[in-house]
Amino acid sequence: MDYKLYDFDNKSILRSGKRWFPTMGEIHYSRLPHKFWKEELCKMKAGGVDIASAYVIWIHHEEIEGEYDWSGDRNLHGFILAAKECGIKICLRIGPWCHGEVRNGGFPDWLLHKDFEPRTNDEKYFSVVEKWYAQIYEQVKDFICRPDDE
């Protein structure tokens, strides 16, 4: 069959040529003990959720500048694996600023003491954010949706 995986018309999104009305939920993995991730994600799937969005909250992963923690309840890779096992797609909200009711909008405390203003076009700020995004990429590179993925 020759069609794009995702398309749309004036009525809906099409996935693999069929009408699809995605339902999305929210789960903050770094605020939930990792032993419950799969259970909660499978409950979401059973409730009709197709996609779960999740903040990657910077302050939860780099409390100390240059020291990243992707273990335990902060294991983004493991969280995505759990979602995959439950049949839920993940939409990451990588910020760097987040509105997840978290201190500093998720910015690490150390970032606020730098000689630049966060959330601006300052090159120094962009440089720090680029390092953060590179860390996220290392956690998710095996799961990035490509045009031929289901």
Regions found by a protein language model. Give the residues of each.
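Compositionally biased, intrinsically disordered low-complexity regions enriched in proline and serine
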Residues: 4-7, 30, 69, 134, ...
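The substrate-binding groove and active-site-proximal loops of carbohydrate-active enzymes
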Residues: 22-34, 57-75, 111-131
